[in-house]
């Protein structure tokens, strides 16, 4: 019987081979490849334009670029799903392959690919609405920079890893890749080259052809043509991302600069009416519109004499976001709207009414904001020169039909020449650090969640610059019924000035014995005697004169009340029953006249002629005011003097004017009732105050006074400065004040000697002034400002005939670069008053060189004088002294054509002193209170019969 043969063991089943990329997956792969190829070409174009912008410092991104960027986002989103599906299936198909190297490289490629997708999604800033969506948006610039470069680097690493990964598979067909790169390079390169011919030209003046549309305003458009109103009135578009900035702007004086401001409306209507009756058109009023009414002006509607200044769509726009942020060039610092503005380049669909297209536009802006930022925020916007375009004016012949040039308001030049800017070498005080632009004060940082908010160096939270532009226009805020805006302006005004009851003089005369400084010692007043109260107002934190701007209608005055035992015994600055301030008060304003001696009291610029007086206080300076007080003989109780510096935006005369000119159909004016007298209830803000109680001889009552918070040396210095700035009337008293200051044992400071030198120089006592300067230079703790010492030394040396030394002094001011100047941000090379003085000195040196053998030296000095005067004109093209100097220098050089040119310009900018005297005489007869205030020496009586408030009894 045979044995059974065992059957063979079954062979193990071989695993079914799964290709890495099967037929159906290959279709998906090619779809991914096509999307990646298109994205690659698109990315090459985007990267090229970005690099071109970065390398040149110009913006080459435009509407087409943003359309391509939208395509980049769309293609990227479209790629996500097929790419992830392909990677998932491909990973499953190859996870068991034996080629571990290929698998590891594949995993690395997977990580790099995911990095591309995730970084792209993080950069998108997709906003779906709501706080949760906003929280997902990455705003931190440092984090975004890291993500951006990851998004750039990851695709490059993908290419390298893909090549390594493919070494395990079929050979790469390089000819296809080469062809793709060639076509992509040619097309993208050509498109990038076309960007190099971008028609937008920033930082240059618009064509002169635009004058026919805009003159006598100096504003220009970049094309010379009008700009559509739609482009200038797109504020709601800005609101989407800049809510806090928009809110500030909405309540600002900039927003209500135009026909939406009832005060301006009445004034500009008068200007247009006068121009139309005189010229047959309203083109003279363009002078106003370049700054106040940019939307109707730049869009072409303003020139219509029948322009509906209430209901026209552009009439209520004011200075819009685009009106400022689309300015591409400051043509000069002449003011009068001397800027160039463009129709800004927007992202695709910016003006679309379709909600989806608007959403796409918003995402493009947020994902790629560089073009938006460069278009709407340029370096010029951060400069004081930008503000000069509208905060400096002159009155041209086309407006007044009198003279080609009259200076109007001017914030810019006093700021430039102040110590605050770090450019003025002749100031009484200097800040620890210069403030290099207007926004340093008027656009303070404000915490914000706006999309454009960022963490500034000196901020604890993301912030923006305050677009309320806090300043002082409480009147307009009151008319618009905005108490929050009033409060913001009043908060801004705190600690900007101070008032100091500094001393009293016996006999009520400036020559009387001075008791000062009051506090801690208080002199005892004698019943029946007359005293002079010495009051000082000091500007503290401002870079321009107080008040500047609309100085003819700003109402700022000293309100003085003297009481004893509950009764008022002295008064100045009271308000009568009609809400008018006593005209015999001391006003810090400009009393402006027309040619017939009438006060400019309606904001009527076409009639401005000359000021009767100018009581403004320069930055870092002071004004001294004298009050005569007759102490009643029957007084038995202490005397309390309270001085308040009061501010009201408009006086009663002006509020009566603009309310009486309201027409049917106008927007309502707060407090105005047609047919009834208007009550001027505009807010009165107390800017600063001081109170002193004096003991009275014969009274046993004791008095207490709070301690003065600022040092004695400053009080003496401010008092002396105020006297010095009055001109020649009180130079002796100023010298006495500075002499006392120079003699103080504690602290020992240079101010007394230095400012005494100023007084002695003005008096012509040059040797004594030189000695005082030498004494000021000896102080070391703190040292006297070497630039001011050098300037005054140059002035004195020049007048003493030591021209070589004077030139060295003045060049030291302008050219030295010291450690202290650098640390504090000072650059006195822009002080054009010193530059002009250098030009005069060089010219005088040249005149001393008479020998024919030294002709070369003479001509060299004359050429240097020309250079100095030309530098002045770069900074102030309307400088009358520089034009006169050039006229004389060119005459000596034999250049009669240029001498005649500058003679003509000198005549244009020179004041008409003869005509001014006629207006003065007429004004003095019409306005006795103003005539008194215009005298070189003014003493305001506190016991004037009939003064408002005299009979008021304090409770």
Where in this protein do the model-derived segments appear?
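Primarily the internal scaffold of c-type cytochrome electron-transfer domains
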Residues: 3-12, 101, 140, 172-183, ...
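Start-of-helix register in tetratricopeptide repeats
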Residues: 714, 751, 785-788, 826, ...
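Membrane-embedded alpha-helical bundles that constitute the cytochrome b-like, heme-associated redox core
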Residues: 2-205
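TPR/TPR-like (Sel1-like) alpha-helical repeat modules
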Residues: 810-816, 863, 880, 884-915
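Structural motif corresponding to the intra-repeat A-B loop/turn of tetratricopeptide repeats
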Residues: 726-728, 763, 800, 845, ...
């Amino acid at each position: 019987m045979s044995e059974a043969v065992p059957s063979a063991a079954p062979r193990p089943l071989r695993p079914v081979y799964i290709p890495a990329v099967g037929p159906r997956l290959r279709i998906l792969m090619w779809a991914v490849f096509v999307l990646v190829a298109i994205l690659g070409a698109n990315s090459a174009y985007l990267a090229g334009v970005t690099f071109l912008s970065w390398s040149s410092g110009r913006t080459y991104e435009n509407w087409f670029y943003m359309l391509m960027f939208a395509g980049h986002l769309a293609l990227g989103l479209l790629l996500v799903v097929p790419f992830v599906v392909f990677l998932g299936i491909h990973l499953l198909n190859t996870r068991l392959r034996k080629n571990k190297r290929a698998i590891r490289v594949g995993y690395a490629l997977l990580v790099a690919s995911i990095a591309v997708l995730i970084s792209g999604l993080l950069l998108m800033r997709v906003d779906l609405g709501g706080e949760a969506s906003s929280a997902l948006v990455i705003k931190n610039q440092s984090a975004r920079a890291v993500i951006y470069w990851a998004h750039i680097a990851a695709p490059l690493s993908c290419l390298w890893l893909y090549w390594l990964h493919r070494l395990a598979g079929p050979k790469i067909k390089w000819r296809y890749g080469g062809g793709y790169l060639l076509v992509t390079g040619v097309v993208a390169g050509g498109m990038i080259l076309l960007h190099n011919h971008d028609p937008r030209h920033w930082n240059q003046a618009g064509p002169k052809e635009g004058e026919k549309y805009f003159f006598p305003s100096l504003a220009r458009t970049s094309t010379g043509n009008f700009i559509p109103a739609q482009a200038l009135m797109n504020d709601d578009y800005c609101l989407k991302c800049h809510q806090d900035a928009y809110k500030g702007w909405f309540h600002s004086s900039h927003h209500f600069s135009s026909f939406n401001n009832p005060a301006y409306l009445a004034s500009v209507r008068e200007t247009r009416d006068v121009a139309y009756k005189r010229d047959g058109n309203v083109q003279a009023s363009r002078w106003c519109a370049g700054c106040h009414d940019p939307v109707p002006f730049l869009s072409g509607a303003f020139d219509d004499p029948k322009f509906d200044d209430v209901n026209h769509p552009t009439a209520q726009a004011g200075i819009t976001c685009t009106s400022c942020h689309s300015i591409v060039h400051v043509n000069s610092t002449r003011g009068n709207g001397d800027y160039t503005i463009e129709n800004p380049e927007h992202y695709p669909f910016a003006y679309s009414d379709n909600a989806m297209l608007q959403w796409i536009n918003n995402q493009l802006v947020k994902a790629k904001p560089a073009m938006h930022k460069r278009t709407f925020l340029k370096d010029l916007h951060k400069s004081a020169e930008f503000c000069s375009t509208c905060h400096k004016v002159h009155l041209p012949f086309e407006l007044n039909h009198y003279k080609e040039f009259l200076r109007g308001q001017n914030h810019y030049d006093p700021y430039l020449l102040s110590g605050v800017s770090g450019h003025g070498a002749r100031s009484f005080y200097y800040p620890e650090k210069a403030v290099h632009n207007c926004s340093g004060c008027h656009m303070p940082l404000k915490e914000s969640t706006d999309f454009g908010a960022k963490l500034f160096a000196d901020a604890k939270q993301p912030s923006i610059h305050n677009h309320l532009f806090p300043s002082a226009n409480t009147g307009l805020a009151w008319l618009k019924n905005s108490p929050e805006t009033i409060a913001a302006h009043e908060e801004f005004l705190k600690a900007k000035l101070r008032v100091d009851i500094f001393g009293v003089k016996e006999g009520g005369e400036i020559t009387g014995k001075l008791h000062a400084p009051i506090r801690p010692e208080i002199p005892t007043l004698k019943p029946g005697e007359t005293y002079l109260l010495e009051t000082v107002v000091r500007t503290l934190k401002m870079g321009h004169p107080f008040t500047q701007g609309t100085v003819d209608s700003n109402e700022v005055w000293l309100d003085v009340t003297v009481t004893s035992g509950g009764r008022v015994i002295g008064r100045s600055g009271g308000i009568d029953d009609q809400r008018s301030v006593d005209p015999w008060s001391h006003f810090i304003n400009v009393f402006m006249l027309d040619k017939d001696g009438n006060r400019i009291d309606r904001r009527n610029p076409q009639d401005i002629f000359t000021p009767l007086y100018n009581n403004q206080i320069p930055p870092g300076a002071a004004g001294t005011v004298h009050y005569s007080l007759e102490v009643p003989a029957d007084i038995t109780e202490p005397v309390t003097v309270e001085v308040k510096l009061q501010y009201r935006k408009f006086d009663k005369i002006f509020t009566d004017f603009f309310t009486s000119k309201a027409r049917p159909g106008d927007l309502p004016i707060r407090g105005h009732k047609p047919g009834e007298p208007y009550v001027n209830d505009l807010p009165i803000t107390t800017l600063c105050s001081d109170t002193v109680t004096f003991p009275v001889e014969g009274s046993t009552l004791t008095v207490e006074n709070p301690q003065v918070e600022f040092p004695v040396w400053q009080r003496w210095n401010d008092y002396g400065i105020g006297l010095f700035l009055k001109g020649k009337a009180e130079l002796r008293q100023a010298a006495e004040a500075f002499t006392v200051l120079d003699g103080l044992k504690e602290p020992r400071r240079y101010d007394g000697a230095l400012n005494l030198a100023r007084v002695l120089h003005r008096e012509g006592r040059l040797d004594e002034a030189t000695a005082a300067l030498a004494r000021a230079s000896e102080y070391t703790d703190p040292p006297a400002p070497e630039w001011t010492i050098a300037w005054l030394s140059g002035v004195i040396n020049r007048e003493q005939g030591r021209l070589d030394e004077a030139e060295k002094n003045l060049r030291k001011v302008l050219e030295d670069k010291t450690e202290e100047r650098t640390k504090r941000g000072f650059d006195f090379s822009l002080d054009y008053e010193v530059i002009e003085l250098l030009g005069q000195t060089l010219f005088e040196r040249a005149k001393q060189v008479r020998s024919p053998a030294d002709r070369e030296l003479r001509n060299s000095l004359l050429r240097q004088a020309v250079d100095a005067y030309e530098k002045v004109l770069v900074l102030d093209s309307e400088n009358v002294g520089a034009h006169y100097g050039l006229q004389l220098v060119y005459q000596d050089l034999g250049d009669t054509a240029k001498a005649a040119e500058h003679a003509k310009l000198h005549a244009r900018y020179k004041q008409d002193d003869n005509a001014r005297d006629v207006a003065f005489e007429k004004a003095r007869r019409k306005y006795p209170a103003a005539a008194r205030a215009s005298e070189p020496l003014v003493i305001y009586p506190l016991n004037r019969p009939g003064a408002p408030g005299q009979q008021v009894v304090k409770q």
